[in-house]
Each structure stands twice: as C-alpha cells, then as structure tokens.
C-alpha cells in the first residue's frame, strides 16, 4: 500500500496541483478574479481550471494570486479541517515536473 503524501502550506508550491480546488484571489486581469474550480491541468505558464459549469478556463500563473484548498486528509496528520493557502502565481512559474522534483531535493538535504 502506498503511503499518502502530506501537503503542507510551506511546501505546496512543490506539489502536484492537479485535483486541488482553487480560487483566483487577485490578478492584473480583473475578469479572472473570483474564478473557482478544480485544477485539471498545468503547464509552465498556465493553470487549467474546470469550474462548476464544467467549463475549462486557462489562467496565467504570472501576475495572479491563488487560494488553494488542501483537504484535511492530504494535510498534516490529525488535522480535521481543510487548509486554505494563498500563493503568488509567479512562484509556480516552472514546468510542473521540475517543480515537483525540487521537493525531493529539499527533503534529501533539509
């Protein structure tokens, strides 16, 4: 049985984002503010979010701010409530697979 990977607020930017719920809390493009949904894909510069109407929306990471919901079952052991984490999109600007590799380096050396 595979062990569950914990997602902590301090390491969220290194984790897989697909499947997490998200809200755009700020953006240089005012029409993006308030968009909510689930991340269904990610590229170096974009998050693809499926909203409640099953529409796929492409949101640039640069110049946007996101609030991610980390479900209690994926967060710290013993936590009973979800965690909401605000992240500047510029911190996510890299290919997802490279960003995920960086957490392995942190764990190895940290």
UniProtKB/Swiss-Prot annotation:
GO terms for molecular function: ribonuclease P activity; RNA binding. GO terms for cellular component: cytoplasm; ribonuclease P complex. InterPro entries: RNase_P/MRP_Rpp29_sf, RNP1, Rof/RNase_P-like, Rpp29/RNP1. Its EC number is 3.1.26.5. Its main location: cytoplasm. GO terms for biological process: tRNA 5'-leader removal. Gene3D superfamilies: Ribonuclease P/MRP, subunit p29. It is found in: Cytoplasm. Part of ribonuclease P, a protein complex that generates mature tRNA molecules by cleaving their 5'-ends. Belongs to the eukaryotic/archaeal RNase P protein component 1 family. Consists of a catalytic RNA component and at least 4-5 protein subunits. This is Ribonuclease P protein component 1. It comes from Methanosarcina mazei (strain ATCC BAA-159 / DSM 3647 / Goe1 / Go1 / JCM 11833 / OCM 88). The gene is rnp1.
């Amino acid at each position: 049985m595979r062990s569950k990977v914990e997602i902590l607020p301090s390491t969220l930017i290194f984790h897989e984002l697909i499947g997490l719920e998200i809200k755009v809390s700020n953006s240089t493009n005012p029409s993006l503010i308030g968009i909510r949904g689930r991340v269904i894909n990610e590229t170096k510069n974009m998050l693809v979010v499926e909203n409640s109407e099953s529409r796929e929306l492409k949101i640039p990471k640069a110049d946007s701010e996101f609030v991610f919901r980390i479900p209690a079952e994926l967060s710290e052991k013993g936590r009973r409530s979800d965690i909401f984490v605000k992240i500047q999109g510029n911190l996510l600007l890299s290919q997802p697979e490279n960003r995920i590799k960086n957490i392995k380096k942190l764990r190895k050396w940290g």
